[in-house]
């Protein structure tokens, strides 16, 4: 039986934080160890420049994201790990798919519709004011990313289901018009994946400014944890898990029995300050080895580059083969 192919893309527009680790990185690394799965993971740097126009941020983020996944246990021998911009075949496929994609489909993309709505609310006469073609057409590039390797499943959040549905639509259109070359990808939503709460109780997100950095040292992690909001209950007063985001973060780094014990300690009057020390210790214990590996990789980025180039070589071998069939199907052939 052939293996199920799973593809994941990570945009290079920021430095990963604890929420990224719990919600995406840790579960994806574990899933990649499944012997029945063939995993593809890529750094989506071309997607990054759609919204981020700071070259240094794109560059630094590419290094940080790659180092993060490797430090957290991604095995480049088991997972095809590459940088999007190292696979020129993706961009050629992107153009071919652009030529068969209905404009109406792009008009329905959530990001574009949100931009148009914002213009209307701001009184702009031009509904497309400020809309660049990268934002408008990026679902086609995302489709090329997926179809280039005929992924069976694409793990996404609920807000990105539309992207995979569009990829299915475009793949089906190509298959019908030219030749059956593309697998119709399926959405993969893991209901068990945790969305980590931030310092203020909302979803941990850099846009909220409520994150806990992933790669700080033990002392700085403790300082970050100390910022988690709590109520004014004194030491000795019983406390409930829902009275602070601290409990949910602790739960993400603990076994069920440890979580139960922590719940009892809170009920018995554990001081918030002591609870924060226990949480920081949990985080630091789990991340001790990954932090050491991360520092090694970022101190010598050529190690990262070597791994990415090896992944690109592996990916391009397959991409060239499929693109050759796509070119032939649309009539781009050698003259004989």
Swiss-Prot record:
GO cellular component: a single term: cytosol
Motif ('HIGH' region): 12-20
Keywords: Aminoacyl-tRNA synthetase, ATP-binding, Cytoplasm, Ligase, Nucleotide-binding, Protein biosynthesis
Keyword ATP-binding: yes
GO molecular function (one): tryptophan-tRNA ligase activity
Main location: cytoplasm
Enzyme class, broadest EC rank: ligase
Keyword Thylakoid: no
Annotated motif 'KMSKS' region, positions: 203-207
Enzyme nomenclature, EC number: 6.1.1.2
Pfam families hit by this protein: tRNA-synt_1b (PF00579)
Compartmental location: Cytoplasm
CDD domains in alphabetical order: TrpRS_core
Top-rank taxon, per record: Bacteria
Annotated family: Belongs to the class-I aminoacyl-tRNA synthetase family.
Protein name from the UniProt record: Tryptophan--tRNA ligase
Organism name: Neisseria meningitidis serogroup A / serotype 4A (strain DSM 15465 / Z2491)
Primary gene name: trpS
